[in-house]
Each structure stands twice: as C-alpha cells, then as structure tokens.
Amino acid sequence: MVRLIGLFGAVAFCFSTSAVAQTSDQAVIDQYWARWNDGEGLKLLNHLAKCVAERHPAAADAFVTNTTDATALQKDQEHLVDTGCIKKYWFRTSSTTIDPEAYRPMLAEALLTTSYSSGSIPAVNAVTAELDRPRLPNVPIEKVHPYYRVMFLIDKHNAALAGYSECIVRQQQDAVLALAVTPLNSEEEATALAEIEKASPNCDPYRPDVSFPSYVRRGDLMLQLYSLTRLAGGQVPQSRS
C-alpha cells in the first residue's frame, strides 16, 4: 500500500519539535521541508505528477484547486496515486510515501506544462479574485499555546510565501512558466528563481522572513500560477491515455 502523509504527519512533526525550546523560525522551516530535500524522493514525485497529469488531468486539477479538504488525496488514490505511474519509475509501490504538500505543486506544474506547452496561457494579472489560502489570526506567537506554536510558525511562513509567490506570478507569469523547463534542483533552476525574484521588487514587501529550499519556492510559484490561470478561464487539459 502506498503511504500517504497528511494531517497525522503534520501532527507527528509537531510532537517531534514542540519540546524544543527557543527554536528559531528558520530552523523550524528547515526541519519541516528537509524531509523532501533528498533528491530521489522529489524525482519520484515529479515523475508521478507528470504521469498523473497526462492520464487523469481532471482528478489532478480537482486536487490542486481544492486546498480545503485534507483527505482529498486519500479519497482518490486510484487516480492521484496511480500505481502504474509509480511502477514506471520505481518497481515497488509499498515503500512509496506521498506528501500532499509536496505533491500538489508538482501536479500544478505538470498540468501547466500539459495545458500551455505552446505558450497560450491566459493573462492572470487582471484576475481580481483572491486565491483560497489559509488566513492566520494576527496574534503574537507568545499568545499561541505552546503545543501549537510550531505548526503556527510553519503555517505563518508558508502563507507568507504563498502571498509573495502570487505577487510575482501576477507580474511575471511568462517567466514563471518558463521556469518549468529547468531541471528540478539544478543550477538552471536556482538561477532562474533568483532572476525572477530580483525582477519583482514590487513584491519585496511580501517576501517571507525566512528562506525556503528552491524546490519549495519553485513549487509555490507553479501552484499560484495554475490556480490563477484557472480563475482566468484556463481549461483543464484532456487525458492523453
């Protein structure tokens, strides 16, 4: 059985870190995202996302755009975790772990490259609707119960990254889409990300207070771009299988 990380994985992370006193925000973010910074896990997720986007685009679109259902991945494992796709890359499925938070951005990128490989992407800078993302209460961390502080910090900084990414996408959607052709975790990716961020000075007020791995920054840009293209009238790609 393919293992899925969801709410219980996040809770387990809280248990593992909540006892650490005075941990810096950066250390919390580093530890949280380090679980997917091994390269091979990302390659498998990337392969799975591309295969699923081609075989089951409607299911992939529903999962990417529905960020409120924490059990969405479990509900549609047949399509979203297609074992046939996994076996094309890895001969076993029992040891495969899928984290929705890492998988959703990769599916978004795969859907973008499937839908708009010709470059005919809808303009997103005129989309007035706000993207659906968590809105955290504006309270100081000292007011948060110690048990929830780690997840509060993670949600806070992830939300800041989402706002920063959305700002960049609204200004540089073509450059963000071009980022998809760079290999994952490569020098080309790092260079492209740096250039995109440098060319978006108007978004600096939204820049997170902590740094994120390149694959997280890339993924969040792709997630915001896909979400905005759907709001701009972009269509779900058709299955190629």
Where are these regions (language model features)?
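Bacterial N-terminal signal peptides that target proteins for export
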Residues: 1-7
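Cleavable N-terminal signal peptides
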Residues: 8-9, 19
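N-terminal signal peptide c-region/cleavage motif recognized by signal peptidases
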Residues: 14-18
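N-terminal Sec/ER secretory leader and immediately downstream segment
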Residues: 22-119
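Surface-exposed, polar/charged faces of alpha-helical domains
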Residues: 39, 54, 58-65, 152-155, ...
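Extracellular/mature segments of secreted proteins
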Residues: 59-62, 92-101, 175-178, 209-219
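Extended amphipathic alpha-helical interaction segments
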Residues: 104, 108-183
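A cross-kingdom marker for long, charged
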Residues: 188-241
